Amino acid sequence: MDILVPNKPKYRSLCMCFHCHSAQASLDGGSSVKALVKRSKELGRRSATLTDHGQMGGLAELYEESMKAGLTPIHGVEIYLMSPWEPPKIYKNGKEEPATCHMTVLFKTQKAYEYFSSLTPIAHERALIKYGDMKPLLTWEELQEIGNEIVLGSGCYGSAVSKALKAGNPELAEQIYQQIRSIVSPESFFVEVMPHILDQKWIRPEYDKVSKEIIKSGMFVPNDLDECGSPIDLQKASNQFMVQMARKYKDPIVISEDAHVAVEDHKVVQDVRLGDNWRFSCSYSLEPTEVWADSLMKQMPDITSRDIEEWVDNSYKIFEQFRGYKFLTSKNRHLLPTMESVYNVSSDTSSVQHLKKLIVETGRFPKDPEKAVIYSERLKEEIRVLTQLGYDFLPYVFTVHDVCIAMRERGYLANPRGSGCSSLVLYLIGVSIIDPIEWKLPFSRFLNEGRVKGGSFPDIDLDISIREVCLDYLKAKYQDNMALISTDVAMRLKLTIREVERWMFGKVRSSTEDVLDDMPFVPQGVSDLHFLFGYEDESTGEHVQGFLESGSQAAEKLKNYIETEKEIWEVVLACSGIPKTRGVHAGGVVITPVPIQSIIPLTKVNDQLATAYTMKWVEYVGGVKFDFLGVKTLESLSHSFKAIQENLGVVFD
């Protein structure tokens, strides 16, 4: 009996992807961090890497997903460097714009992570906006400063070396190469060879009308043609030069995928996200070594199988440099403001002592002996839960108290909503106007021992009549220790259908608009798939009817669209839920005992700095969210109270 033996791969798997982008940062990423980690695992790799363009917002998620998958997370960033080797571009109006180049940086230590995170505010202040994407800029000197803590790659087609080569100056290209490799130790510099056939880097929207129509139909126009009209592989010359330099200076070479999608099928998501900004002409996905070996050996006929094996082996050498990397999360720390930063008190004063002082000053503790016993027992239990279960949550309470009192002193209404009103502590120090004992509200609605042991923090939503005043107060008080929290603005169902049609046809067809006009919007907090097909309610276990099950005329229209436009619908499902842009959390801010950018990278959203991590990942790395919500109804009430006081002499507490 013949035994079938599966074909053994010619090459072992790459240990890691040296250069990888996600949909979490710039528009040219087409896959989620989770999908990239999953693909790395499928390919038999030992690690997952993320080096988004100028952004670090996906690094916490990469760490979590990698740990769950049993992979080593490798953090990094592809920086936009203000090139010291090129003159600035000068426009007709006299405005100067610095020349930029790309460089791949991997963090060997937590110190490197914190260093690049700390530079995110200034990098975003210098940022260029190009074709809808932001390019935060760093300087050569800032890169040199951290050389001992990083692994450095020679970069992609947008690197300084490749740009000098493209400009026809190989001498300058070699000088730049020498300078770059000198920043780090020899074992921490790797020459990147890109296994892509790059017949064009991208298509820009300013091309003529004919080119635009070709782009919209999914085809591509080569930027460069040889004499016979065949596309020139722009990457080929760069790779050949890099290999030449590596051999001359005895530097290790690594196959650098520059992945922008996990699998080739995700490229359509990348295209839809980019819209008319530009379109990659080939798929930058994570692939088996054999695929890249074939590509590189076709590009460079002098490359042998032994070269490929050596380059694969180098990926394992890189991996070894990250075994000791430690990334701090909420398992290691909780970054609450200190009591001393909230109030002008001595560090010798305990949080419980200061709480009792506030209670006395507020004067809400009952003087009746019988009531005092009841209140004392409840207060004792609340203090136990807040301070004696492994955490001291009173600095969180004090921060909210300080904001609440400051807003009221300035003439603005402020009061907690929801479960926070179940806390006697909040009532006794003057934050809440609701006496939870009088209204029979149990403290367990707000916080209990089980929740604390499960890792939950107290969550006080403070409603304020004018949020901007509150934010100004927080910025003045905490300065770099406070930041807004960003949100992902995902591609939801209606938007996704429109974006996909614009990508495929250059416009949204009128028949499709007719379908969309009758569709309700997906409710907040409900996924597109749950909205369409229904879901099981977690609290009741009952099936919640989906829109397509409703039998309405609008639902039947959408059903017909799905049946007749199957190709479009597949793309819609692939894109749905992928971030399209960034927003700012309606109420959330994070306040820490140290400058935020040293632990949480920042980004620019609508011309204001906010955390590059969304709320889930801010809390994952130990940040604590405070909710200060602007409520227009309170502003209206405030005006009403003032009018009543002025006209009737009635004063409200």
Model-derived features with residue positions:
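Alpha-helical scaffold/interaction cores of sigma-54-like transcription cofactors
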Residues: D2-D653
